[in-house]
Amino acid sequence: MQLRAEEISQIIKKQIQNIDKAAQVTETGTVLTVGDGIARVHGLSRAMAGELVEFTGSEGGSLMGLVLNLEQDNVGAAIFGDTSSIKEGDAVKRTGRIMEVPVGEATLGRVVNALGMPIDGKGPLETKERRRVEVKAPGIIQRQPVTEPMQTGIKAIDAMIPVGRGQRELIIGDRQTGKTAVAVDAIINQKGKGVICVYVAIGQKLSTVRQVVDKLDAHGALEYTIIVAATASETAPLQFIAPYTGVTIGEYFRDSGRHALCIYDDLSKQAVAYRQLSLLLRRPPGREAYPGDVFYLHSRLLERAAKMADVFYVVSKGTKIEGGDASYRGIDGKAHVGAHGMHSAKDSLWKTIDGALFEKLEQARKDEKKDEIKKLEQQLSDKAKASDYEIVRDPKSGGSLTALPVIETQAGDVSAYIPTNVISITDGQIFLEADLFYSGVRPAINVGISVSRVGGNAQIKAMKSIAGTLRLDLAQYRAMAAFSQFASDLDAKTRAQLERGARLTEILKQGQYVPLAVEKQILIIYAGTQGLLDSLPVSSLSRFEEELYKFVEAKHPQIFTDIREKKVLDDDLKSRMTKAIDTFKKRFAVEAGGASTAADEDGAGDDEEEAPAPKAKSKNAKSASKAKEK
């Protein structure tokens, strides 16, 4: 077969035409050194800080890395995975992408690693959206003050150190003092409240993470929880990035108008991992060998927790809004954001339907004519109802992300570098003390130095009305208890304060994995602060509390319903609570024995005052027997 030159040239031309002209240009480099999760790469002169790079191993596998250092002749990158497959001379390719993780409803009930990949053996994540791990925190205008309570189910916290939705509350204490237990109880208590929980385990044992997963599953809490695990066996880069993955997953739910709770257990391990990376990257060390930007490491993470502002629009009646579109505007060309958004939207609506009448209202406001203001507002309100316009709220606004970071201290030293940093960033701290823990006070919360700076605004009025008395009584008890160690004889008032304090301390004790509904907390704390438990022995209070809840649920269920719905303790409700507690106390005393019954009937204060009675009887008996002998 002979081919002519013309045919050959035509074949070549066709082949050239079929070649895709869009050439793909990729910048590649080579590994200079690798070890301890860090690689030095030469040849990526145009790489950007925070960019993902792809390492291609000599054995064919590939790993992702994150550019952290940009130097004159090389780039320092943290490798996400086992570095044993990466060797000197291996190729490294730029991706041009910032690190992203999958987010969405499919993550609920799953255990993922620091890269957002599932590790629970339940198959791949079927998510439609990916989000950047590093984003700016919401600005001032996008936020609103904390006003809704985030009930933890723990009496001592909800009463004296309340947490609100959108708050950042630090849990701090030595190792093995119950920090994780407090966090897990808070997750369990969110069941049925519409709160999505994200638990980030940093540097923990795999067995510990497994226990947490099993406990959440046993209490039906795993269905609304996502576990992000960067365990002790993971490399430092994965432990460093895990909290950012967790908050990114939580932000998805916050930005869809829902409420999320993020727990970082614990940030001390993240700081240690970041210190390791920084030292390997030859960054200058500072205090305790941490790098200079370790404060920013935690501040940019915790600032992403926020209560988002509600957004209102003036629209034509019947208009449906999907929400979440920052560029959307109402018929007045505005989006009314923030604490005064509803007020602003109302004014805009009134101005749209009757500008002349609204001008009169504005003038009346300037002149402070209250009666005229009220009259004009009513007229405009009636016109607004009859108009073709209405005010609607963006359904994806008003969400919240609450952060509960955990910090481990050494021998109770809260003045160390990382604890002081995180204390200054957060809106309060719950301090767990080893001495209290080992003395049987669990949760071992030191109420004296624990504080919530903004949660009080979110606390329900019923709890607020009794919590002030509780904190004061406990403070007096601690002062008196310290004083009584040196005093041999105490007056009746001091003894009564010590007795009251001992009972209040006892009722604040709580078992693990048994969070309490707020109405039950209010009932028992009310009983303690009003002195209704003073006649009961301290040792019986735990059983008394448990049986009191059952009694009220069975005989007086309306009390719990009223507390839950009204959220205020009026005189009638207080009277019914007191009556129910007194009724049950008599029954409890009869079951406990005759001595307690007598104490209830006589209204005796404490056991010490009842003790001399038997001695008096024995003395009279002796004198009577002597008289008979004579």
Curated annotation (Swiss-Prot):
Compartments (UniProt record): Cell inner membrane
Record organism: Sorangium cellulosum (strain So ce56)
Chief localization: membrane
Function: Produces ATP from ADP in the presence of a proton gradient across the membrane. The alpha chain is a regulatory subunit.
Gene it is expressed from: atpA
InterPro entries membership: ATP_synth_asu-like_sf, ATP_synth_asu_C, ATP_synth_asu_C_sf, ATP_synth_F1_a_nt-bd_dom, ATP_synth_F1_asu, ATPase_a/bsu_AS, ATPase_F1/V1/A1_a/bsu_N, ATPase_F1/V1/A1_a/bsu_N_sf
Gene Ontology cellular component annotations, sorted alphabetically: plasma membrane; proton-transporting ATP synthase complex
Keywords for this protein: ATP synthesis, ATP-binding, Cell inner membrane, Cell membrane, CF(1), Hydrogen ion transport, Ion transport, Membrane, Nucleotide-binding, Translocase, Transport
Family, as annotated: Belongs to the ATPase alpha/beta chains family.
Protein name: ATP synthase subunit alpha
